[in-house]
């Protein structure tokens, strides 16, 4: 099955945001390195950039929104799960043209690709509670 350009943008954004989180480099450095080094064929590049930059720009507000729905301390959340939650929360909060059900489903699907065995269930549980709190249900 062919993966949509937006799904590819989300997958790439998760990888780049994870790199940003781990490396502590600027988002501009991470973006440049990512688009230079990775195969960006089939990626909605403008959407990738919007997700990457937007999530990085609003990361403190996003973390504040996510925090009440975590079942553990923020630093105990797996870094890839945290990154997926940040990206999906950015979309729920700031990309209002994307239906909330699509955002949740995409978060689940990206977690199936990058997360551990049960990551998608954890992501689903949090996003399902977070969406109404952000006025998206």
Curated annotation (Swiss-Prot):
Function (record text): Involved in transcription antitermination. Required for transcription of ribosomal RNA (rRNA) genes. Binds specifically to the boxA antiterminator sequence of the ribosomal RNA (rrn) operons.
User: This chain belongs to which protein, by name?
Assistant: Transcription antitermination protein NusB
InterPro entries xrefs:
NusB-like_sf, NusB_fam, NusB_RsmB_TIM44
The alphabetized list of GO BP terms reads: DNA-templated transcription termination; transcription antitermination
Keywords attached to this entry: RNA-binding, Transcription, Transcription antitermination, Transcription regulation
Q: Which organism is it from?
A: Haemophilus ducreyi (strain 35000HP / ATCC 700724)
**Protein's gene:** nusB
Q: Which GO terms describe its molecular function?
A: RNA binding
What PANTHER family does the entry give? ANTITERMINATION NUSB DOMAIN-CONTAINING PROTEIN, N UTILIZATION SUBSTANCE PROTEIN B-RELATED
State the superkingdom.
Bacteria
Its cellular-component GO annotations read: cytosol
Q: Name one Pfam family in it.
A: NusB
Family, according to the entry, reads as follows: Belongs to the NusB family.
